[in-house]
UniProtKB/Swiss-Prot annotation:
Its cofactor is Mn(2+). This is Xaa-Pro dipeptidase. GO terms for molecular function: aminopeptidase activity; metal ion binding; metalloexopeptidase activity; phosphoric triester hydrolase activity; proline dipeptidase activity. Coiled coil: none annotated. It is an enzyme of class 3 (hydrolase). Belongs to the peptidase M24B family. Bacterial-type prolidase subfamily. Splits dipeptides with a prolyl residue in the C-terminal position. Its EC number is 3.4.13.9. Keywords: Dipeptidase, Hydrolase, Manganese, Metal-binding, Metalloprotease, Protease. It catalyses: Xaa-L-Pro dipeptide + H2O = an L-alpha-amino acid + L-proline.
């Protein structure tokens, strides 16, 4: 057995244990996990790109095949119902032949409705996990997406198995190749569209494979947090200021989520990037088991406030900037989030396996994680500094606006903003920065 297969075997043991535990707690017999179905575009004869149920791909890296099922009870060998229709219009999924096949009892479906022949007699005692409740009802599965089951699975998903960590490392290694290619393309004068093509070629994945839409932003577009327009217009060297790329890849169903910002030429903006990069590394060093993620976010706002002071953008004390929300204008999003099967992975607000919810602090409503940081968790650390028109204008009209250096703000607006994002594993003996270790 290869070392990779050994990691996968341990991973399945963990999933089986979690399944046994929650089934016993809830008095259920098993889980019927649906890979999903395609969705037809309204008034069209084509479907939206298929996205697999994350609960399905937690068990195996089958990412592009709808109408598949897993039947798991935490004890027996998991049953995989693999969909292989007779179809001359579309590519049919290949016969499974990978490191994971020996761990499943694999059966084949040629029509979606054949799943009914494979369900247990006690299907009323089985929970359905998936996005098509009408299918669960039609099949007679008695427990569709039970909240207690989902809460338990989402909470424990924060603790990554060694197999999952290796998948995330590989997603970072591949993603870093793309980021280097994207930087080189920007420096060669390419458009956003061309840069994105260079990124996709380097990672070997298209838009439908990506864990999220690539953010490839030149100049002011970097001030749009989720900018995915991809302009095909080239910007002249004289009007070329900055480049922000936030892009990841998928490896066996696990996402990387990496951001870098580059300056076209030396100057104040390049210095800001270097300073924020140093602060990002400092805040990563503060990650310790037992600390709450929201405390780390607040600490980052203190660092950003000192940066705003040091470059004479804002003439206020650190505490006053934070208390009045001035730092939120320049850094409006959260410091980061859990990362794994989904780019914003589940469980970020859950304080226990029952799903007890702790919302983001009122002062920082866009923070995506309030958990206590523990060994085995993976999250992003992504501080930012932006010049966003819709946030700056209310500040200009406020009392605090009198203490902002608006001449400097206007000089920096054309650069859009900065974000620097790494993917971090928390170990008992420290942190592992998967992104930096991959060479970025």
């Amino acid at each position: 057995m290869s070392s990779y297969s050994q990691l996968f075997a341990q991973h399945l043991d963990t999933l089986q244990h979690r399944t046994r535990d929650i089934l016993q707690q809830q008095g259920l017999s098993g889980l019927a996990i649906h890979s999903g179905q395609t969705h037809r575009i309204f008034l069209h004869d084509q479907d939206y790109p298929f996205k697999v149920n994350p609960h399905f791909k937690a068990w195996l890296p089958v990412l592009d095949n709808p109408h598949c099922w897993l039947l798991v009870d935490g004890v027996s060998k998991p049953v995989l119902l693999f969909y292989r229709p007779v179809d001359f219009w579309h590519k049919v999924a290949e016969l499974p032949n990978a490191f994971w096949v020996d761990f499943f009892d694999i059966r084949f479906l040629t029509r979606p409705e054949q799943i009914a022949d494979h369900l247990p007699a006690s299907k009323q005692e089985w929970a359905y996990l998936g996005g098509h409740l009408e299918v669960a009802e039609l099949l007679g599965l008695g427990q569709p997406n039970p909240e207690a089951v989902l809460n338990y699975l989402h909470y424990h998903r924060a603790y990554k198995t060694p197999y999952e960590l290796e998948c995330l490392r590989e997603a970072n290694r591949i993603g870093v190749r793309g980021h280097i290619a994207a930087k080189d393309s920007f420096m060669a004068g390419a458009s956003e569209f061309e840069i994105n093509l260079a990124y996709m070629k380097a990672v070997g994945q298209g838009a439908n494979d990506a864990p999220y839409g690539n953010i490839v932003a030149i100049n002011r577009n970097a001030a749009i947090l989720h900018y995915t327009h991809l302009s095909a217009l080239r910007v002249s060297d004289a009007e070329r200021y900055s480049f922000l790329i936030d892009a990841g890849v998928d490896f066996h169903g696990y996402a990387s989520d990496i951001t870098r910002t580059w300056a076209w030429r030396r100057g104040e903006f390049a210095d800001l990037i270097a300073t924020l990069d140093s602060q990002q590394q400092e805040i990563i060093e503060e990650i310790k088991p037992g600390r709450r993620y929201s405390e780390l976010h607040l600490q980052m706002h203190h660092k950003l406030a000192r940066l705003l002071q040091s470059v004479e953008l804002v003439d206020m004390s650190v505490d006053e900037m934070i208390h009045t929300g001035v730092t939120n204008v320049f850094f409006p999003h959260g410091l980061g989030h859990f990362l794994g099967l989904q780019v914003h992975d589940a469980g970020g607000f859950m304080q226990d396996e029952r799903g007890t919810h702790l919302s983001a602090p009122e002062q920082f409503p866009y923070l995506r994680c309030t958990r206590v940081m523990e060994v085995g968790q993976v999250f992003t650390i992504e501080p930012g500094l932006y010049f966003i028109d819709s946030l700056l204008e209310p500040l200009r009209q406020s009392e605090q606006g009198k203490r902002v250096n608006w001449n400097k703000v206007e000089a920096l607006r054309p650069f859009g903003g900065i974000r620097i994002e790494d993917n971090i594993v928390l170990h008992a003996n420290g942190v592992e920065n998967m992104t930096r270790q991959a060479g970025l």
